[in-house]
Amino acid sequence: MATCWQGLWAYRMYLLVFLLPISLLPLPILVPRKEAYCAYAIILMALFWCTDALPLAVTALLPLCLFPMMGIMEASEVGLEYLKDTNVLFIGGLLLAIAVEHWNLHKRIALRVLLLTGVRPALLILGFMVVTAFLSMWISNTASTAMMVPIAHAVLQELNNTQSNVEEGSDNPTFELQEPSPQKETSKVDEKDNGQAQPLPAVPLESGEHMTQEQLRFSQGMSLCVCYSASIGGIATLTGTTPNLVLQGQMTSLFPQNPNVVNFASWFGFAFPIMVILLLLSWLWLQILFLGINFRKNFGIREQEHEQQRKQAAYRVIQTQYRLLGPMSFAEKAVFILFVILVLLWFTREPGFFHGWGNLVFSDASGRVMVSDGSASILIGVFLFMVPSKIPGLTQDPDNPGRLKAPPALLNWKLVNKKMPWNIVLLLGGGYALAKGSEESGLSQWLGNKLMPLQHVPPPATVFIICLLVATFTECTSNAATTTLLLPILASMAQAICLHPLYVMLPCTLASSLAFMLPVATPPNAIVFSFGGLRVSDMARAGIMLNIIGVLVIMLAINSWGVPMFQLHTFPSWAHSNSTTHCLASPPTAPSP
């Protein structure tokens, strides 16, 4: 009997792949309508995503075959959803992120900021959080965490091991950061990130048996501050994490008449304050939880001499690592300049409060802007393949003396093909296909009619419940899959109750990044947990409070500065459809400005 159960468990994924579609067949058979056919496809994909029976990207391809076979959409129409402008923006942004990582610019920025903040306990945690959050705004959460955790643990080990050396009159100024070697990296890759999938490093933290209780708690706080700030930092920019791009794509797909409400500038103006507030509150919470409330000690005020010497030794670790990078190379300078140019192009294309370069240069006769944020990102991405990585000159080929050799470009396609997370591109496309199929089949209108009773529930209460549910759900499932499934439903609900769609879609998107409680919730958590020194209970205890804080901050944002920014107190004309005629006859249910 035991062998039978073991066999079933071993083949559980194969069983799920065949049994789930069969078990759902009564729905389209008993209700032979397009709405039921589309619901069958959505439920099937949701179950595949939740159970990991198929890879996320493979599941995202199902609309390409299911929708045409069920008569919901033509195959050519479904295919168009897989490379929309949002996907182009994602690809262009990641081209620059790959260049930043390839030329080690992110490490130089990180170490420089840590040299400025110093190594006092509270400021050290703040320094790591600020650096990780900033990096996660522009590159993968996983990549920023994988880079920052070894640096954090190198500093921790120096702080823990230097006291005896200081007492003997010696220190360890030549300590070198031990990066995880390729041979020791695990092959496990998690797709639940905002972009680039990375191997999980398998470098363990020093055993807690040789630490004092105070040292162990400080190391736990340092580890958690890195993974938490990676998730928080991704909130701030439109390209920072996949759910943000899912929202922009769903807005374009579900409400094609909207005047580009969600763009890089508008998202940054709304989400950056959320990131700052959440980062500061998280810093205070981790400080209280792991360092105690002795702020004088945490900030290094009136320290004893041996404590100062220990921190000086740890500071030298960071200095040594920064010196090992050498002077800033031409490639780093070129990537940094292109990075600044791209950010400026994103902010000034169509800022809203003045005419940007998109309005002034690239608009048609009717005044419609012809370029998008994706256009700017691809333009800079192409330049990465055109700009040489060294100052052009008469460079000798080291393999063939006497022959000239041109330096390589900042990026090459082999590197991009290896680093680019094509699975996320397909996942985004699958989400847009689901939204379009739901609209074409009439399922969105049917859901909206069924959700009409929610019109009598206060909008803030509705949003609060949505945030709690999403924050809980995203602890166990991909944040991208969560938003892909829920945003079309929430959009239909908003139309049904005459509520601005962004009033429920924005909180859902932001809450999907509140994955703080479990190691499996997001790759940054898994990376930190794999280094050792943490128990699941440690992460859950710290994370549950951060989830609550995050939900409250989102509620504050959506009911304060979010209202005038997105005009959330009105029901927009671009959200009107045949199912919202009742919204014209009655005042919209919306939050007060």
From Swiss-Prot:
Biological role stated in the UniProt entry: Low-affinity sodium-dicarboxylate cotransporter, that mediates the entry of citric acid cycle intermediates, such as succinate, citrate, fumarate and alpha-ketoglutarate (2-oxoglutarate) into the small intestine and renal proximal tubule. Transports the dicarboxylate into the cell with a probable stoichiometry of 3 Na(+) for 1 divalent dicarboxylate, rendering the process electrogenic. Citrate is transported in protonated form as a divalent anion, rather than the trivalent form which is normally found in blood. Has a critical role in renal dicarboxylate transport.
PROSITE patterns recorded: NA_SULFATE
Catalysed reactions, as listed in the record: succinate(out) + 3 Na(+)(out) = succinate(in) + 3 Na(+)(in); fumarate(out) + 3 Na(+)(out) = fumarate(in) + 3 Na(+)(in); 2-oxoglutarate(out) + 3 Na(+)(out) = 2-oxoglutarate(in) + 3 Na(+)(in)
GO annotations of cellular component type: apical plasma membrane
Impact noted for substituting L83C: Decreases cell membrane expression. Decreases succinate transport activity. Decreases Km value for succinate
PANTHER family, A to Z: SOLUTE CARRIER FAMILY 13 MEMBER, SOLUTE CARRIER FAMILY 13 MEMBER 2
Composition bias type Basic and acidic residues, residue spans: 185-194
Name under which the protein is recorded: Solute carrier family 13 member 2
Gene Ontology process terms (BP): alpha-ketoglutarate transport; cellular response to lithium ion; fumarate transport; succinate transmembrane transport
Keyword Repeat (UniProt): no
Pfam families in the record: Na_sulph_symp
Annotated phenotype, changing T86C: Does not affect cell membrane localization. Decreases succinate transport activity
Domain of life: Eukaryota
